[in-house]
Amino acid sequence: MEGPLSKVLQHIPRDLKFFFDPSSIAVVGATDDASKWGHIIAKQALRSAKRPIYLVNSRRKEVLGRPTFARLIDVPGGVDVAVLAVPVKALSDTIDDALASGVKGLIVITAGLGEVDDAGAQVQREIVTRVHAAGAALIGPNCLGLVDNANEVFLASNAFEPGSVALLSQSGNLALELQGWFSAFKLGFSRFVSIGNQADITLIDLIESSVDDPMTEAIAIYVEDFHDGRGFIQAARRAYEVRKPVVVLAAGSSASAARSAQSHTGALTSDRQVIEAACRLAGVALVNTPRELMIALQAGLQPRRANGSRVAVVTDGGGHATVASDLLEARGFTVPALSPSSQTELRSRLWAQSTVVNPVDLAGYGEQDPNSYADVVTWLLQDPDVDSILISGYFGGYSSPTPFAQGLDKQEISAARTMAETVRAQSKPLCVHTMYPDSPAIAELSAVGVPAHYAIEDAVASLAHSRNLTLGALPDEVELQLPIDGITYCDLMPLILSKGIATPEMRVVHNREEVMHATNAFTGPFVLKANGLLHKTDVGGVALNLPDGEALLREFDRMRSEIGAASYSIERMVDSTNGVEIIVGITQDQRFGAVLLVGLGGVLTEVLKDSVLALAPVDAESAREMLLSLKGAPLLMGHRGRPPVDLESAAKAIAVLSRLGAAHPEWQEFEINPLLVTPIGATALDVRVAL
């Protein structure tokens, strides 16, 4: 049977070159009415004389001073790409006309289909079926168009300044906003595609095409619906492998979007966390705002990367040092004390009141000698205990039009040139927070790709995106198992045991006589559970540590009276001395497939909310890393005299359970809570499935 990744592994990249460098173009719906898309796009298309541009209008002989054709089929020799800007009621016939004329690619601006209602979605599906039957391809509908600057293809509402970034956006208006941001950050576009409803050509296809585009050095994405999440991961990993950074701004992924769930796992799993897990796996930078998207792009395009999180902060004032350090640590960086040898060296380069531990505070020496910045940075860049450097504060001000101190402009520019030369010759990133980002000194640094920001939080974000992103281990392909209908707790516990994971000794009972027989089968203390309940503890359906048969019978009578379950499970009470309860859950995400959650478990799972996510299945090493990334990881390693738990057994159990959950996509939620991990092993104490 096919595994969850089989669709990804069998994906055949589509040749979309004709969209980005067509031999000829037609704009259907071209008009002189400046308020209509047909006018706006036709006017943009005519900016280039590289290829024939045909205007199609069934009612007018001339548009924009050029002769028109009544139908696409009337165009002699046909066209490669047609942009359709027609009313939705005319779209179906227009597409049939285009396909009959031999068009290879359709860019459908028209809205009012799949994004509106089920009837529109059905029409959209029928259109795509006809497009495929004709061997053509379609971008959209409900899109803003396409631009390829290198090939002079201008089929969108606006001009996009040339550059090296491919922008793939599901929102037209956000793309227009990003134009302003790109200009502010001195970046430009290799190409732009408004992906619209992704009825045919998808985000995955366009990522793959952009990876192969020699003019594209980075890919920026705004997406509201990933569709095939695993396909997205595969395509983004291709970009990572050829060193083209991918930055994603994803909408509709807040914690408030978490679905109503029957299990703890579902309640703890938000859309945002799933997307974060997918982006980690793909080596993708995930951002929250258009501004951060620009910061991440700028950082990703510069060639220097930090291989660690140790930052040296250089300032000429204590306030900037304190704020910078706090923000860095909030982003997962450390600002460690420099080695004694580095402190001695820096002390020899500065004056007595300077602080050289880290942060390095020049304490006013910068206005005595701006070259002191270069002296410090040059030394720190070769320090093996430093991964990256942040200058924060006044640097850049001495060469500005309104300097604090006069006559230091040439020295500051000289210092900037020295730093630029030093930075260019090595691999560690330098980032600058400055009150004067437009000064000549900062221009020297910007010329070699050193990011400079007016806001300290932007500078710290830039450093964060300069850290080397690493690819996670791609989940193995798993064989899907035959669905198990109506699976119960009594079925699941033996199934887990058959996979090599310990479970308590158990008997299923229905009446008092069977309870008495069970007490003769094994000794207590006992656990009694009412079967068929999702949250047994909440309704008194679990009784723990029952010492003997008499206590067991009392609890059985109570549960049968109060709950009335069809069956009950009697289990041997497992010794939990020095144990830690873990939750292991697998949910089925409609875009990304099986998602694994690991966290601190038991009855306080949703209170503690200490959990991490990964796409399933995972191997034992990845499971171990997940456990160690929990805030409560010290509990696993031994705490206040307690022995460490058997982490290897826990990791192996999690890996096995992740494969089991991934192999049963009909299990919408599959949860083991708790998995008791002790110094001598791991035991599944409870399990549930929601279909």
Task: For each feature predicted by the language model, list its residue ranges.
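Catalytic-core regions of core metabolic enzymes
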Residues: M1-L691
